[in-house]
Structure formats: structure tokens, C-alpha cells
Amino acid sequence: MKNLRAVYIIWYRDMLRLWHDKIRLVGAIALPLLFLVVFGIGLTSKMGALGPGVNFTQFMFPGIIGMTVLMSSFMSGVSVVWDREFGFLKEVLVAPINRTSVAVGKTLGAATVAMIQGTIVLLFAPLTGVSLSPGTVLMLLPLMFLLAFSMGAFGVLLATRIKTMEAFQAVMPMLTFPMIFLSGVFFPLEGIPSWMSILTKINPATYGIITIRQIALGTTSGTTFGLNLFGHTMSLWNNVGVLATFGVVMILLAMQSFSRQE
């Protein structure tokens, strides 16, 4: 019970920080919308239809939702580095609680913040021509949370090994931007060069982006905007399984890393 309360307090602290930092929320939403407007409106007429009744803006919109969730959850690891530099993390680590609770609380906080931001972007669906029924939204939310939790655990794991804010700010863009561009946010994964195809398949974000897109656009069969792995067309549940496995591995490693913190 004590450890569960510790998870809640750490999670709640991240919620308070988000509530009192409105500029952070606005900035996190403005960048994805900028991508959507510049690339979507600017290139839709040039790209043509990318699927049955799907133009480039509609294709890109689910990817932008995934990108928002990915960036926000992954970058939330910066709070771990921040807390270390200002001494708060040391106080938490010497508290009479299991250190794994800290990793879980931080990851849940990162995932919840990312979910809030992704849900706000989701509200812009009518402007892109994407029609989302209440049932579709209810299916999207747990998928967004799974992506947020997996990437949040990855970010927290890296943050436990990075000692300064400067180093974190240098490393994170080197990881987030390749993951975004190689996950199919801005282009279909069919017909790309073989070397790039390999990179997309080892990119964990790919499986989250594809799943969100298939649900949002109603192509859950896995044949449209899908991914072939070893000659097998990945189904929606295959993609969920890969992403969930990655998330479990990352949170276990993050918990282990926190237990070794000094």
C-alpha cells in the first residue's frame, strides 16, 4: 500500500506541474498542428489519394496524434534529470519506499501527460476530414496510452543514465526525430528502400503509429497502411503485441535502473 501511494504521489506531482505550466501544454500541441497544416494542406494536392477515400491530410492525421504522444511521453524523462540536478530525486530515493515505485510513477505521469496532449489533438479530426465515432475514440485511447507508456518508460530509462540537462537535451532529439520519421508518420511504408524498411521494422514507434492509423481510418484488417514482417502482414493485434512487449521490457529495465541509483 505504501508503494502504491508513492506511485500515486509521483504521478500526481507530474499532473500538478502540467496544470501550472500552460505554456508547455500549448507548445506541445502547436508543433504537431504546425506539421499538420504545413505538410497536410501544402502537400495534399501533390500527393493525391493514398488509399480508398484517404487523402494525404487524412493519412497524416493519425500519425500526428502518435507523434504528439511519442514526443511528449519520451521527453517527460527530462523531469528525472531535472529532479536529480536540483536534489529532489535524492530525497525520493532515500525515502522508505521501493525504488521501483519511482520508475512506475514517473512512467505513468509521462504517459498521462502525453495522453492529455494527444487527446486534445484528436479533437481536430473534423478539420482534417477524418470521421471518428465514439467507438473509434474508445479504441484509440488505450492504444495511445500503450504507446505513451512504452515511450515514457524508454525515456525514463534513458534519463536514469544521463546526468545533466545539457546531455539529455542533446541526446533526445537524436532519438525522437529518427523514430518519428521512420515510423510512417509522414509517408506510407510501402515501396521504401530496403535499408529504410529494416529501420522502420526495428523502430518500436512504428507499431504504435500503424495501429493508431488503422483504427482511425477504419482499416483494421492490416492490409491497408500495414506492415510486412518476415513475409507476414502484421495484424492490429500483432502490432499491439510488439509494442506491449517493448513497453514491458522498458519498464522492467527502468525499474532495475532506478534500483541502482545512488
Per-range role (PLM):
Residues 1-31:
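Aromatic- and glycine-rich beta-strand/loop motifs that create alpha-glucan
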Residues 5-12, 185-228, 237:
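Short hydrophobic, aromatic-rich alpha-helical segments embedded in or entering the lipid bilayer
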Residues 10, 28-29, 60, 64, ...:
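Residue-level recognition of transmembrane alpha-helices
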Residues 32-39, 56-128, 174, 180:
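Hydrophobic alpha-helical transmembrane segments of multi-pass membrane transport proteins
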Residues 39-48, 71, 125-133, 162-164, ...:
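Short helix-capping/hinge motifs at transmembrane helix termini and TM-loop junctions
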Residues 39-47, 150, 159-210:
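Transmembrane helix segments
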Residues 40-41, 214-262:
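Alpha-helical transmembrane segments of multi-pass membrane transporters/translocases
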Residues 99-177, 232-255:
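Alpha-helical transmembrane segments and their short interhelical loops
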